Amino acid sequence: VANALQTVLHTALCCLKARCALIASCPHVALGVGGRLGEILRGVLIRHGANPDLVQWIFRRASRATTSAFMTHSGVALVVASAGATVLRAAHSSGRPALGMGAANTPVWVAADADLAEAAQLIVASKSFDHGLTPGCEHNLVVDRAVRAAFVEALEQAGAVVLSDYDVEHFARQALDAETGSLRADLIGQSAAEILAHAGLDRGLEPRLVVVPQAPDKVLGPWGREQLA
């Protein structure tokens, strides 16, 4: 799974309601928090007289081979994969029934007649929840040119930091992987304040969200992708 807490908790509840056991495999950056959640769930099962082994997880650094071995095991009734393209392909070619969820990259259109203050508040609240790890939250904003300036102001009032053109170039050099163009792995799931500090753009504030403006011809570039932060 990619989003350890939300995905494991939701999947565990679905499995338990269906009277099925669960084995969770979290990415290495989430092994600690994933294991802690597993312990909490097992504790709840024990308190209610249920078998704690209904919820299990891979608690050491798992390789792709280990994950594949679990997914292809004949005792597995269903594979639920929320991860990158490689894991999704492995899940759907495992020979077991599989449900896969990849990048969402949800866009939002802010029209000229929108309530800009409400739109900004809802977008900032949604994208900043869980430090942007929710695939279904807003990842790209498409704003009508007629209200762009007013919407930028509304975003800032809602707690966002909207970068200037100069800051965008500097921020990209610090936040994106030079080889892949993707967000640096150590910034995934980090707060807006931590990301700005890493890029040397600490404003002395407690921002809830970093907004990186892009020209229309740049939408297929790195910042047009899903950003899990």
Predicted regions and their residues:
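A structured beta-alpha segment of the ubiquitous adenosine-cofactor-binding alpha/beta core
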Residues: 55-76
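ALDH superfamily catalytic-core signature
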Residues: 9-24, 43, 88-223
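A glycine-rich helix N-cap at a beta->alpha junction
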Residues: 42-58
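Structural motif
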Residues: 25, 57-60, 82
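Substrate-binding/gating loop at the entrance of the active-site cleft, primarily
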Residues: 1-20, 27-39
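Short acidic loop-to-helix transition motifs that present clustered carboxylates
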Residues: 60-65, 85-87, 105
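Glycine-rich phosphate-binding loop
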Residues: 76-91
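Conserved glycine-rich beta-strand-loop-beta hairpin in the small C-terminal domain of fold type I
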Residues: 224-229
